[in-house]
A protein has these predicted regions:
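Short, Lys/Arg-enriched N-terminal segments with co-localized hydrophobic residues
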Residues: 1-5
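N-terminal small-domain helix-loop-helix segment of the aminotransferase-like
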Residues: 7-98, 105, 285-288, 394
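Conserved core segment of the aminotransferase class I/II
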Residues: 52-53, 227-301, 309, 391
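Conserved core of the PLP fold type I
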Residues: 63-193, 210-224, 228, 232
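Conserved active-site segment immediately N-terminal to the catalytic lysine
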Residues: 198, 215-238, 258-264, 352, ...
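Conserved glycine-rich beta-strand-loop-beta hairpin in the small C-terminal domain of fold type I
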Residues: 283, 300-308, 320-333
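PLP-dependent enzyme catalytic core of the Aspartate aminotransferase-like
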Residues: 336, 345-353, 360-394
């Protein structure tokens, strides 16, 4: 949108606000007070349209049972059409309190205990937890990594599907932590055709769909056509607009038989809807948050280019994966830190809270860290300078 910008991007110091990223480090790191670059939420105030909508609802003074307005669905439908060229129908949309909850439920709906479920590692670690916690057989097909450039090993992917009689594939699109925005031929001619041939269900986690840079373009999995009977996608306003605490996401199910399976499951568990504040926040964000998102993407891009340039100059053998999408930077530090010393060096010497590589699929990724760039330039500078000051060539 051209003209005078009314929206501003406001950094918020979230320390001492019951913020998990800054105030909840004890559980994952065994201590507090680290410089936080881990949990995937932002340190930016949300769009003013969200604040205004929530303020108006709060000031109504009544928070009883909530009827979900058509405008909630329409705001999302309009967003998908305008930003991704994809026409979603209201009757396809189901509620989940979060993308993670959604794929946990879908695991239970679409598979049985001990069924094999495949993922592309390194991958968002709740995928791994979901498979294990639901007593399914976790199958990992590693992405190919050529000096930080990630691609799909389709031969390995298909072989593991056939060898293990895989029943379900959980796709991360865009991919966390590798930062890939998959091209249409990769998902359709690759993943989806293989899954069709072997009767494998697909859950497509598209929570980072709006966080895409440069000429890259997110392809909604369901927009590729022909796979509705084996595919469900999950999206949310939470990553895009920094409202994860509102606990509101959308499960998109075009196929009537899959809708029936989902509906029967949630009725049996009496999870029929979310809380009113989540609906209000998500509706407002999708309806009015576009200008704010543009500012966020510009800031993340600036932060990434700074990190990339500084490390190229000061730690030239660190491999920074290209950031096509997400605001999460995946960095290989094996030239400077032994994998078994990574946590000691990064946490104790650098005093950083990052997501450690082994969380994303095991020891073979222990030389990596994932850093969250959805924060102020100053915070990124602190993190980068801590790495430069404490890492030396092995």
């Amino acid at each position: 949108r051209r003209g005078i910008r009314m929206e501003k991007l406001v950094y918020v110091d979230r320390r001492n606000t019951n913020c998990n990223k800054w105030d909840g480090q004890q559980k994952m790191f065994g201590e507090e007070g680290l410089h936080a670059m881990w949990v995937a939420d932002m340190d930016f105030r949300v769009p003013e349209c969200v604040v205004s909508a929530l303020r108006e609802y709060v000031e109504s003074g009544v928070y009883g049972y909530y009827k979900i307005p058509d405008a909630y669905y329409q705001a999302f439908i309009d967003w998908e059409r305008e930003h991704h060229g994809y026409e979603v129908k209201k009757e396809w949309i189901r509620f989940s309190p979060g993308v993670v909850a959604g794929f946990h439920w879908l695991l239970q709906i679409l598979t049985e205990e001990n069924d094999a479920v495949i993922v592309n590692t390194p991958v968002y670690y709740p995928f791994l937890d979901a498979v294990k916690n639901n007593h399914r057989n976790l199958i990992c097909s590693d992405l190919k990594n050529e000096n930080g450039e990630y691609s799909i090993d389709f031969d390995d992917f298909e072989k593991k599907i056939t060898d293990h009689q895989v029943k379900l594939f959980i796709l991360c699109s865009p991919h966390n932590p590798a930062g890939r925005v998959w091209k249409k031929e990769e998902v359709k001619s690759g993943f989806f055709e293989i899954c069709r041939a072997h009767q494998v269900y697909i859950i497509s986690d598209e929570i980072h769909q709006d966080l895409v840079f440069g000429e890259n373009k997110h392809i909604p999995s369901l927009s590729t056509g022909e796979y509705d009977d084996i595919m469900v996608s999950i999206v949310a306003a939470s990553k895009t607009f920094n409202i994860a605490g509102a606990q509101n996401s959308m499960v998109i199910i075009p196929d009537e038989k899959l809708q029936e399976k989902w509906d029967a499951y949630v009725k049996g568990n009496r999870v029929l809807g979310g809380n009113a504040f989540g609906y209000v926040a998500a509706q407002a964000a999708y309806a009015g948050g576009n200008e704010w998102l543009t500012l966020v993407l510009d800031q993340i891009e600036e932060n990434y280019q700074y990190l990339k340039a500084e490390l190229a100059e000061k730690l030239p053998e660190a491999v920074v994966t290209p950031l096509e999408g997400t605001y999460l930077c995946w960095i290989n530090l094996e030239a400077y830190v032994r994998a078994d010393e990574m946590k000691e060096v990064i946490q104790k010497k650098c005093r950083l809270a990052v997501d450690f590589g082994d969380w994303f699929g095991g020891e073979r990724f222990a030389a990596f860290i994932r850093m969250n760039l959805a924060t102020s330039k100053e915070n990124v500078e602190i993190g980068v300078n801590a790495l430069i000051a404490n890492l030396v060539r092995k």
